[in-house]
Amino acid sequence: MQPFISHTGLAVILDSANVDTDQIIPKQFLSKVTRDGFGVHLFHDWRYLDEAGDKPNPDFNLNQPRYKGASILVSQENFGCGSSREHAPWALADFGFKVIIAPSFADIFYGNSINNGLLPVRLTDAEVKQLMAEVEAKEGAEIDVDLQALTVTSPSGALFHFEIAQSARHNLLNGLDAIGLTLSHVDTIANYEANIPSWRG
Protein backbone atom coordinates (compact mmCIF):
# COMPACT_ATOMS: atom_id res chain seq x y z
CA MET A 1 0.00 0.00 0.00
CA GLN A 2 1.35 3.41 -0.94
CA PRO A 3 1.67 6.08 1.77
CA PHE A 4 -0.94 8.83 1.63
CA ILE A 5 0.46 12.22 2.66
CA SER A 6 -1.56 14.69 0.61
CA HIS A 7 -3.36 14.74 -2.69
CA THR A 8 -4.52 17.44 -5.08
CA GLY A 9 -6.86 16.24 -7.78
CA LEU A 10 -9.77 16.88 -10.07
CA ALA A 11 -13.04 16.52 -8.20
CA VAL A 12 -16.31 14.98 -9.38
CA ILE A 13 -19.73 15.22 -7.75
CA LEU A 14 -22.03 12.32 -6.95
CA ASP A 15 -24.96 14.21 -5.46
CA SER A 16 -26.76 11.25 -3.92
CA ALA A 17 -27.27 10.11 -0.34
CA ASN A 18 -27.13 6.48 0.79
CA VAL A 19 -24.93 5.30 -2.08
CA ASP A 20 -24.73 1.61 -1.29
CA THR A 21 -22.03 -0.90 -2.11
CA ASP A 22 -24.25 -2.66 -4.65
CA GLN A 23 -24.37 0.58 -6.64
CA ILE A 24 -20.63 1.10 -6.21
CA ILE A 25 -19.85 -2.39 -7.54
CA PRO A 26 -22.85 -4.60 -8.45
CA LYS A 27 -22.84 -8.20 -7.24
CA GLN A 28 -22.47 -9.75 -10.70
CA PHE A 29 -18.90 -8.42 -10.87
CA LEU A 30 -17.65 -9.89 -7.59
CA SER A 31 -16.28 -13.19 -8.87
CA LYS A 32 -12.62 -12.13 -8.61
CA VAL A 33 -10.65 -12.13 -5.38
CA THR A 34 -7.79 -9.88 -6.53
CA ARG A 35 -8.10 -6.13 -6.16
CA ASP A 36 -7.48 -5.06 -9.75
CA GLY A 37 -9.91 -4.83 -12.65
CA PHE A 38 -12.97 -3.62 -10.74
CA GLY A 39 -12.76 0.01 -11.84
CA VAL A 40 -14.36 -0.67 -15.21
CA HIS A 41 -17.50 -1.84 -13.38
CA LEU A 42 -17.65 1.05 -10.88
CA PHE A 43 -21.21 2.45 -10.65
CA HIS A 44 -22.11 0.16 -13.57
CA ASP A 45 -25.88 0.59 -13.30
CA TRP A 46 -25.54 4.38 -13.32
CA ARG A 47 -22.69 4.68 -15.81
CA TYR A 48 -24.26 2.53 -18.51
CA LEU A 49 -27.65 2.31 -20.18
CA ASP A 50 -27.27 -1.39 -20.96
CA GLU A 51 -26.26 -4.48 -19.00
CA ALA A 52 -23.24 -5.16 -21.20
CA GLY A 53 -21.72 -1.76 -20.49
CA ASP A 54 -21.54 -0.75 -24.15
CA LYS A 55 -23.75 2.35 -23.92
CA PRO A 56 -22.44 5.01 -21.50
CA ASN A 57 -25.06 7.16 -19.80
CA PRO A 58 -24.22 10.71 -20.97
CA ASP A 59 -26.01 12.24 -17.98
CA PHE A 60 -23.82 10.50 -15.39
CA ASN A 61 -21.00 12.75 -14.22
CA LEU A 62 -18.21 10.19 -14.53
CA ASN A 63 -18.98 9.91 -18.25
CA GLN A 64 -18.69 13.64 -18.89
CA PRO A 65 -15.43 14.88 -20.44
CA ARG A 66 -14.96 17.61 -17.81
CA TYR A 67 -14.57 14.96 -15.11
CA LYS A 68 -12.23 12.63 -16.96
CA GLY A 69 -9.36 11.66 -14.68
CA ALA A 70 -11.13 12.71 -11.48
CA SER A 71 -9.46 11.38 -8.34
CA ILE A 72 -11.62 12.96 -5.63
CA LEU A 73 -15.29 12.04 -5.26
CA VAL A 74 -17.65 14.35 -3.37
CA SER A 75 -20.92 12.76 -2.30
CA GLN A 76 -23.70 12.87 0.27
CA GLU A 77 -24.35 11.24 3.64
CA ASN A 78 -24.13 7.54 4.47
CA PHE A 79 -21.82 6.75 1.57
CA GLY A 80 -20.94 3.06 1.28
CA CYS A 81 -23.95 1.65 3.12
CA GLY A 82 -25.30 -1.82 2.39
CA SER A 83 -23.27 -5.02 2.34
CA SER A 84 -19.75 -5.17 3.74
CA ARG A 85 -18.07 -6.12 0.44
CA GLU A 86 -14.46 -4.95 0.34
CA HIS A 87 -14.77 -4.84 -3.44
CA ALA A 88 -16.38 -1.37 -3.11
CA PRO A 89 -13.18 0.47 -2.10
CA TRP A 90 -11.24 -1.79 -4.49
CA ALA A 91 -13.41 -0.56 -7.38
CA LEU A 92 -13.12 3.10 -6.37
CA ALA A 93 -9.33 2.85 -6.02
CA ASP A 94 -8.94 0.87 -9.24
CA PHE A 95 -10.91 3.55 -11.09
CA GLY A 96 -8.42 6.13 -9.84
CA PHE A 97 -10.04 7.68 -6.78
CA LYS A 98 -7.75 8.62 -3.89
CA VAL A 99 -10.24 10.46 -1.67
CA ILE A 100 -13.97 10.25 -0.96
CA ILE A 101 -15.53 13.28 0.74
CA ALA A 102 -18.98 13.04 2.35
CA PRO A 103 -20.82 14.11 5.52
CA SER A 104 -20.87 10.50 6.75
CA PHE A 105 -19.92 6.96 5.78
CA ALA A 106 -21.12 3.48 6.63
CA ASP A 107 -18.77 2.18 9.33
CA ILE A 108 -17.59 -0.98 7.55
CA PHE A 109 -16.99 0.85 4.27
CA TYR A 110 -15.06 3.53 6.15
CA GLY A 111 -12.74 0.95 7.71
CA ASN A 112 -12.33 -1.02 4.49
CA SER A 113 -11.37 2.15 2.63
CA ILE A 114 -8.63 3.02 5.10
CA ASN A 115 -7.32 -0.56 4.99
CA ASN A 116 -7.01 -0.24 1.22
CA GLY A 117 -5.34 3.18 1.08
CA LEU A 118 -8.48 5.12 0.10
CA LEU A 119 -9.02 8.17 2.31
CA PRO A 120 -12.61 8.81 3.47
CA VAL A 121 -13.01 12.42 4.64
CA ARG A 122 -15.97 13.51 6.74
CA LEU A 123 -16.98 17.16 6.44
CA THR A 124 -20.14 18.95 7.54
CA ASP A 125 -23.19 19.13 5.29
CA ALA A 126 -22.54 22.82 4.68
CA GLU A 127 -18.90 22.23 3.75
CA VAL A 128 -19.81 19.43 1.35
CA LYS A 129 -22.46 21.62 -0.28
CA GLN A 130 -19.90 24.40 -0.72
CA LEU A 131 -17.44 21.99 -2.32
CA MET A 132 -20.13 20.72 -4.68
CA ALA A 133 -21.11 24.25 -5.68
CA GLU A 134 -17.51 25.23 -6.39
CA VAL A 135 -16.77 22.06 -8.37
CA GLU A 136 -19.96 22.47 -10.41
CA ALA A 137 -19.20 26.14 -11.11
CA LYS A 138 -15.72 25.67 -12.55
CA GLU A 139 -14.59 23.08 -15.04
CA GLY A 140 -11.31 21.50 -13.97
CA ALA A 141 -11.87 22.41 -10.32
CA GLU A 142 -9.35 20.73 -8.02
CA ILE A 143 -9.47 20.00 -4.31
CA ASP A 144 -6.43 19.57 -2.07
CA VAL A 145 -6.54 17.08 0.80
CA ASP A 146 -3.68 17.10 3.32
CA LEU A 147 -3.66 14.16 5.73
CA GLN A 148 -0.76 15.55 7.75
CA ALA A 149 -2.50 18.87 8.35
CA LEU A 150 -5.99 17.30 8.37
CA THR A 151 -7.27 19.93 5.96
CA VAL A 152 -9.30 20.14 2.77
CA THR A 153 -8.79 23.16 0.52
CA SER A 154 -11.63 23.97 -1.86
CA PRO A 155 -11.14 25.23 -5.44
CA SER A 156 -11.63 28.81 -4.18
CA GLY A 157 -9.12 28.37 -1.36
CA ALA A 158 -11.59 27.85 1.50
CA LEU A 159 -10.01 25.73 4.22
CA PHE A 160 -11.90 22.97 6.02
CA HIS A 161 -10.63 20.74 8.82
CA PHE A 162 -11.47 17.08 9.30
CA GLU A 163 -10.83 14.42 11.91
CA ILE A 164 -9.63 10.85 11.63
CA ALA A 165 -8.52 8.32 14.24
CA GLN A 166 -4.82 8.61 15.01
CA SER A 167 -4.25 4.92 14.27
CA ALA A 168 -5.91 5.21 10.85
CA ARG A 169 -3.95 8.37 10.08
CA HIS A 170 -0.69 6.65 11.06
CA ASN A 171 -1.40 3.66 8.85
CA LEU A 172 -2.31 5.79 5.83
CA LEU A 173 0.67 8.11 6.23
CA ASN A 174 2.98 5.10 6.39
CA GLY A 175 1.24 2.96 3.77
CA LEU A 176 0.38 0.21 6.24
CA ASP A 177 -2.49 -2.20 5.74
CA ALA A 178 -3.25 -4.90 8.34
CA ILE A 179 -0.43 -7.12 7.08
CA GLY A 180 2.02 -4.25 6.82
CA LEU A 181 1.16 -3.12 10.35
CA THR A 182 1.85 -6.62 11.67
CA LEU A 183 5.14 -6.83 9.78
CA SER A 184 6.23 -3.50 11.26
CA HIS A 185 6.25 -5.27 14.65
CA VAL A 186 8.00 -8.42 13.43
CA ASP A 187 11.05 -7.92 15.68
CA THR A 188 8.86 -7.49 18.76
CA ILE A 189 6.84 -10.58 17.82
CA ALA A 190 9.99 -12.63 17.24
CA ASN A 191 11.46 -11.50 20.56
CA TYR A 192 8.26 -12.43 22.38
CA GLU A 193 8.16 -15.88 20.77
CA ALA A 194 11.84 -16.47 21.56
CA ASN A 195 11.19 -15.79 25.24
CA ILE A 196 8.14 -17.98 25.70
CA PRO A 197 9.00 -20.57 28.39
CA SER A 198 9.38 -24.07 26.98
CA TRP A 199 6.79 -25.43 29.40
CA ARG A 200 4.16 -23.31 27.65
CA GLY A 201 4.80 -25.16 24.41
From Swiss-Prot:
Role: Catalyzes the isomerization between 2-isopropylmalate and 3-isopropylmalate, via the formation of 2-isopropylmaleate.
Pathway membership, UniProt: Amino-acid biosynthesis; L-leucine biosynthesis; L-leucine from 3-methyl-2-oxobutanoate: step 2/4
One GO cellular component term noted in the UniProt record for this chain: 3-isopropylmalate dehydratase complex
Identification of the protein by name: 3-isopropylmalate dehydratase small subunit
Protein family per UniProt: Belongs to the LeuD family. LeuD type 1 subfamily.
Organism of this sequence: Shewanella halifaxensis (strain HAW-EB4)
Keywords, sorted A to Z: Amino-acid biosynthesis, Branched-chain amino acid biosynthesis, Leucine biosynthesis, Lyase
The protein's Enzyme Commission number: 4.2.1.33
Assembly information from the UniProt record: Heterodimer of LeuC and LeuD.
InterPro entries with a match to the protein in the record: 3-IsopropMal_deHydase_ssu (IPR004431), Aconitase/3IPM_dehydase_swvl (IPR015928), AconitaseA/IPMdHydase_ssu_swvl (IPR000573), IPMI_Swivel (IPR033940), LeuD (IPR050075)
NCBIfam families: leuD, PRK01641.1
First-tier enzyme category under EC: lyase
Reactions catalysed: (2R,3S)-3-isopropylmalate = (2S)-2-isopropylmalate
Record has Cell division as a keyword: no
GO molecular function, one term: 3-isopropylmalate dehydratase activity
Top-level division of the source organism's lineage: Bacteria
Protein's GO biological process: L-leucine biosynthetic process
Keyword Amino-acid biosynthesis in annotation: yes
